[in-house]
């Protein structure tokens, strides 16, 4: 038995300088776990609700003392004496206590911090690393999506699309994939500098230059890949997050940097042309979260050659994902633990995706912390892909360093899938 003895929460700070929730769970055998909730900038309308205080005199209204208090009172009272190793029972008890569909009463940020902390404490009690404790499938090291050019909501620049990423599919291991990424990141800094562009970084550690067009983001990355000594299309593939819900207004997509307005079909066709022209293997949220007809068209047109990832579309919600699978919408889901708010529901979404032949990409948020739980989740579930930012900023690097450690611990069991991570593409 590993019974919960005490729970304590506090307000801490995320990578954007905004408050977030941290929870500690202590078990009767002295084991202790800690969890911190991340926070997003571009959010899907159907995400679980972060509880914020709304007191404009403190942190601009973004304080989380109400959520902290909910942990220190109601959630603590509920969970004291409960068995920590029964994660599903713990998570379901918190969901029932909250009583809303979207965790709005207690706050998904409160529930998630406790969910993570319970798992960490239980793993420590059993003497296991977190990934081993959480294991639901064969271990797989995740191929990283490394966000090296930031735009959209993640940067104050002229680039409309939110993320341009590299994926080291040709690397033989996790640690080598990280080396490939770091070398390209440094090469890109030089490419941008030589062209007279700013080399300041955005929320996720990627560069945020004022480029002449959205397409130039791809061409400068291709230059950097070559300058670093790698081959685009073989060693490295490109991935994008268009975050198109941020560009959608009155049924059209507005690309401000190019002063263009596109219909849903035109948006799909634009992205499709890029997939033909460049080594792009994955596009996330190419359309607005409500534009299911557009996603259907994109899936029918490009779903056999392109990973079409639903983020705002599915918000890590098994119910919404199930509907998408039934309608043939997209072929991949982005997994953000705070979109749904418990580890149990996160694992359910990953398993549902796999069972349907969809891929799952475990992801950070733009407001991150030193918490590395998503690295362990990616390995434990065999998801095969992770999106955790660029090769700068400690809030991003913490996850890469954890993956290096896990790979070392696993030894010969550490399989790095490379292009096999895209098991549903032809």
UniProtKB/Swiss-Prot annotation:
Tell me where in or outside the cell this protein is found: Cytoplasm; Secreted; Cell surface
Residues annotated as binding (2R)-2-phosphoglycerate? 162, 336, 365-366, 387
UniProt-listed Pfam families: Enolase_C, Enolase_N
Cofactor(s) needed, names only, are: Mg(2+)
GO MF terms here are: magnesium ion binding; phosphopyruvate hydratase activity
| EC class (word) | lyase
The record's cofactor note says:
Binds a second Mg(2+) ion via substrate during catalysis.
For whether the record's keyword set contains Transmembrane helix, the answer is no
Q: Which family does it belong to?
A: Belongs to the enolase family.
Q: How does it assemble?
A: Component of the RNA degradosome, a multiprotein complex involved in RNA processing and mRNA degradation.
Question: What does it do?
Answer: Catalyzes the reversible conversion of 2-phosphoglycerate (2-PG) into phosphoenolpyruvate (PEP). It is essential for the degradation of carbohydrates via glycolysis.
Protein name, please?
Enolase
| Species, as recorded | Hydrogenovibrio crunogenus (strain DSM 25203 / XCL-2) (Thiomicrospira crunogena)
